[in-house]
Amino acid sequence: MKLTPKELDKLMLHYAGELARKRKEKGIKLNYVEAVALISAHIMEEARAGKKTAAELMQEGRTLLKPDDVMDGVASMIHEVGIEAMFPDGTKLVTVHTPIEASGKLVPGELFLKNEDITINEGKKAVSVKVKNVGDRPVQIGSHFHFFEVNRCLDFDREKTFGKRLDIASGTAVRFEPGEEKSVELIDIGGSRRIFGFNALVDRQADNESKKIALHRAKERGFHGAKSDDNYVKTIKE
């Protein structure tokens, strides 16, 4: 008997599903893998029998297991189960959403938030900087990008922004349309303040000496708003 990799996978899934069913019958609470295998194997068998539609199996898949049939936390881990099943008229994807109803118990890793506003970057001193996009394309800056090194077509006092980032929620951004001018709030970058990457204007500890070097580099490379002493010469030792 020669089986394709897909057929071998289905055979393994059937075996896992049967094992899970037997354990369920013995009153053993199922883990994540066993729960998914039981639901998937049942759907495959019913689809092969050809007496139920894909829509019917989607609904039936939600009735196979109850919260008491699985270990604590498993129900909340399974948001959906998708299985490609063979029906008489061909292969169809059967997706069962929320296959196990919530038990009402605490979920591992669950967070309980206070019903009040959260103050971001509390206690950090912010500075306001006016920025203008003198380029012909929109520029979007992420919350933790070193603002000193943003797109060269943004014109602002770069020296004032050295070692700082946007004072906005993590993962959000500020967008500047072509020709747009607006003020943004900036705060100091935290941690060890070793700044690497971005536009490679710093690549070292963010201190007063590295600021002079970064301003010199920015001016040489055409970053708007970068002003440095033309007589300043510094040999960078790598």
From Swiss-Prot:
Annotated compartments: Cytoplasm
Involved pathway(s): Nitrogen metabolism; urea degradation; CO(2) and NH(3) from urea (urease route): step 1/1
Assembly mode: Heterohexamer of 3 UreA (alpha) and 3 UreB (beta) subunits.
Keyword list, A-Z: Cytoplasm, Hydrolase
One Pfam match: Urease_beta
InterPro entries per UniProt: Urease_beta-like, Urease_betasu_sf, Urease_gamma-beta_su, Urease_gamma/gamma-beta_su, Urease_gamma_sf, Urease_subunit
Family annotation (Gene3D superfamilies): Urease, beta subunit (2.10.150.10), Urease, gamma-like subunit (3.30.280.10)
Superkingdom of the source species: Bacteria
A biological process term (GO) from this entry: urea catabolic process
Entry protein name: Urease subunit alpha
Organism: Helicobacter pylori (strain Shi470)
Transmembrane segments: none
UniProt region (Urease beta), positions on chain: 103-238
Gene Ontology MF: a single term: nickel cation binding
Positions of the UniProt region annotated as Urease gamma: 1-102
Enzyme Commission identifier(s): 3.5.1.5
Catalytic activity: urea + 2 H2O + H(+) = hydrogencarbonate + 2 NH4(+)
Keyword DNA repair assigned: no
CDD domains hit by this protein: Urease_beta, Urease_gamma
Family: In the N-terminal section; belongs to the urease gamma subunit family. In the C-terminal section; belongs to the urease beta subunit family.
One GO term describing the cellular component: urease complex
